[in-house]
């Protein structure tokens, strides 16, 4: 892929990333702490699961919403650093309390998105 054909996708991801990261920053400023990061990652997993099932093949929409907005909103690296900084019990609880709900949320989002897609097809 040449540089010219990357210009629009990079701009779309950058714009989405700025929006998602700004939303995460605002939430973390309003409610600082590891549990806000947990909530952000679980909600982001739910939304990405839904997105995976509902956004059509339009590459720019997927890049903007998935890689950009939700990629900027969620944060695995902050989750990892926060876990390492905690004592062993809190870190273990935090890891389990993040990963299991995030996986379940992603699946729930995918199921909801699948049902939404089927309902749209039935109407069309």
Curated annotation (Swiss-Prot):
It catalyses: fluoride(in) = fluoride(out). Na(+) is not transported, but it plays an essential structural role and its presence is essential for fluoride channel function. Na(+) binds at residues 71, 74. The chain crosses the membrane at residues 1-21, 30-50, 64-84, 93-113. It is found in: Cell membrane. Coiled coil: none annotated. GO terms for cellular component: plasma membrane. One of its GO terms (molecular function) is metal ion binding. InterPro entries: FluC. One of its GO terms (biological process) is cellular detoxification of fluoride. The keyword Cell membrane applies. Keywords: Cell membrane, Ion channel, Ion transport, Membrane, Metal-binding, Sodium, Transmembrane, Transmembrane helix, Transport. It is a multi-pass membrane protein. It comes from the Bacteria. Belongs to the fluoride channel Fluc/FEX (TC 1.A.43) family. Fluoride-specific ion channel. Important for reducing fluoride concentration in the cell, thus reducing its toxicity. This is Fluoride-specific ion channel FluC 1. The lineage of its organism: Bacteria, Bacillati, Actinomycetota, Actinomycetes, Mycobacteriales. The gene is fluC1.
């Amino acid at each position: 892929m040449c540089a010219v054909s990357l210009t629009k996708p990079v701009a779309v991801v950058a714009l989405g990333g700025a929006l998602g990261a700004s939303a995460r920053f605002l939430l973390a400023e309003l409610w600082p702490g590891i549990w806000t990061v947990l909530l952000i990652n679980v909600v982001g997993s739910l939304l990405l699961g839904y997105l995976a099932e509902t956004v059509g093949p339009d590459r720019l929409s997927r890049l903007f919403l998935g890689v950009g907005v939700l990629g900027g909103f969620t944060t695995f690296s902050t989750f990892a650093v926060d876990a390492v900084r905690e004592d062993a019990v809190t870190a273990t609880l935090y890891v389990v309390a993040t990963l299991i709900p995030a996986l379940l949320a992603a699946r729930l989002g995918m199921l909801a998105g699948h049902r939404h897609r089927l309902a749209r097809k039935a109407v069309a």
